[in-house]
Amino acid sequence: MVIRYQHTQLGTLMLVTLVSGAIFFAATAYTLPSPGRWGLLAGALLLVVVAWLFSSLTVSVSESELQWRFGPGLLRFRMALVDIVGVSVVRNSVLNGFGIRMRPGFRLYNVSGLDAVELRLRNGDVRRIGTDDARGLAAALRRQ
């Protein structure tokens, strides 16, 4: 499989927010008696795991498919290019959030920023893939 396009975006704001929350939980845990401490430490660990899973978003386009994965690749998605009937560059509202979000009318995959590429699929579904290189990704998808 020949990769025609590949780009990784670091989720800086997400990392800073989640790791800061984990540090706050862990620091607060040491001020509490033992029973309450474990809940906060578990919360801190959960935030670190989520930060690791959503630390980046890598998007690649080959001659036949589009793939995207979060962080180390445990959350991985793919679709055939022939299933994409429309490609456009869009700007999301900050209210759409980050991560994997189901919004009215589309599903969003994003780690940082508001720019995205909207994909209209043959079956009528709409996907948005957030990226800081929306024009480059859209151009790679249009070259199919």
Language-model regions, residue ranges each:
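Short, solvent-exposed secondary-structure boundary motifs
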Residues: 40-52, 98-102, 106-109
